[in-house]
Amino acid sequence: GVVATPFAGNVPDIDVLAYANGKSLPIQVKALRKGEISTNGNIYLDIRFDGDTQIIDGKSEEIDRELVFVLVKIGKHYGEDDFFIFNQGVVQDLIFREYSKFLDKHNGIRPRNPRTTHCAYHVKDVVEYRDNWDLIFERLGMD
């Protein structure tokens, strides 16, 4: 089996540490009841400004694309939660695609607040990773 321990407090990028077979695996957990998962585009992308115009120079190389994310869609009733398990690289690719598309649509200038880098992704964007527990098991040498 897997032993998992949550972290209380502010540990960057790690909410749970899983351990099995002499291997440990940091896991980032995001939970939501409805809506979207908000984040900051600057975390995932290299964004610079030319006045109010945002220019994406590419994906940030500071990101650990292999960090495991578990997105929990909390159900209405006990036992109805959905789990989506994927690498942080999936999030970075989604943010890159959608953020670029949005900036292209608005000629590089965010309509409400040109300086914001707020962005989000949705459960529908990661539905293919539902119950993808094998990602964790493989990383812990349990395959």
Range-by-range predicted roles:
Residues 1-12, 17-143:
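Mixed-charge (Asp/Glu-Lys/Arg
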